[in-house]
Amino acid sequence: MSQVYNFSAGPAMLPIQVLRQMQDELLEYEDVKASIMEISHRSTDFIAMAQKSEQDLRDLMNIPNHYKVLFLQGGASAQFSMVPINLLHGKTKANYAYTGHWSKKAIVEGSRYCDVNICTNSSDNKYTDIDVFENWDIDPDGAYLHYTPNETIAGLEFDYVPEVDMPLVADMSSSILSREVDVSKYGVIYAGAQKNIGIAGLTVVIVREDLMGSVVANQPILFDYTIQAKNDSMYNTPSTYSWYVASRVFEWLKQQGGLSVIAKINQTKAKTLYDVIDGSNFYSNPVALKYRSWMNVPFLLADENLNGLFVEKAAINNLITLKGHRSVGGMRASIYNAMPQKGINELINFMKVFEKENS
């Protein structure tokens, strides 16, 4: 089978080494004589895998001991509810940065639990720029500040971490594990797994212990961080296979040399692609230079009538899932950790040929 490069925004490409390991272990996990999908989450074998996966993630991200790591369900969308449920602590306000599609979803859900103060808004520039932090309108009475470091659809990414005197909450679904992060700056970090962690069905939540223990009344017990932590993320049956895949991805990341190495690779991949876009009169990217995403690279064709042909011919060349989101148009190359430099090179070669044939 020819190598296919999948530029999907999520569920996304997995490392080929992990896919082969999944294939090898599908029918029999290690010495268990059964698939990991078939064994109890209470078994010693599954618990050993779960504990190792947590430790590997702690090692990769240098997570301090006073943070809990949870492996939950419901995707990032469930966290849009769980964050206010667990972090309001009796307050009635919270700060949210509005920089794109996913932060808007968090705002809509957060407003069901509290008064949302939108402290910065990128909708006026169509999510192509982020205001400097000094211009943000932070409500000091807010329980926390929520932001989305990387907006998957627009390809808009922060190049700074907001510094506030309140818990900082980050939806890192599309940027987690792409580089080193100082976890101690955050109260909560959460991420759906299907981009840089593994496959859909799992959500990783990293929460500072002192923020746990007080929840909005009359909410589902599964939405209580404290309950989940006390039960090692197994109050109910977890998404066992998704957890297993994440464990294999964590191992793969460590084998690559950790996040400092991965960050350099990711930065090089993104720069290589942006350089081609910027050096062309045929392709363009509207995002402000300093806020361009490493993970999601949208680009427009000079003639939008060629979009369908581009996607069709790219697929023939084993470059799939390049169609941009309907709200942006054009193309989008999502180049998460699993995408090798060779995949970027193949895309660039195709782009150059397509431009030559259609200019």
Swiss-Prot record:
It is an enzyme of class 2 (transferase). InterPro entries: Aminotrans_V_dom (IPR000192), Aminotrans_V_PyrdxlP_BS (IPR020578), Pser_aminoTfrase (IPR022278), PyrdxlP-dep_Trfase (IPR015424), PyrdxlP-dep_Trfase_major (IPR015421), PyrdxlP-dep_Trfase_small (IPR015422). Pfam families: Aminotran_5 (PF00266). Pyridoxal 5'-phosphate binds at residues 76-77, 102, 152, 171, 194, 236-237. It comes from the Bacteria. It is found in: Cytoplasm. The modification N6-(pyridoxal phosphate)lysine is found at residue 195. Binds 1 pyridoxal phosphate per subunit. It catalyses: O-phospho-L-serine + 2-oxoglutarate = 3-phosphooxypyruvate + L-glutamate; 4-(phosphooxy)-L-threonine + 2-oxoglutarate = (R)-3-hydroxy-2-oxo-4-phosphooxybutanoate + L-glutamate. GO terms for cellular component: cytoplasm. Belongs to the class-V pyridoxal-phosphate-dependent aminotransferase family. SerC subfamily. Homodimer. This is Phosphoserine aminotransferase. It comes from Vesicomyosocius okutanii subsp. Calyptogena okutanii (strain HA).
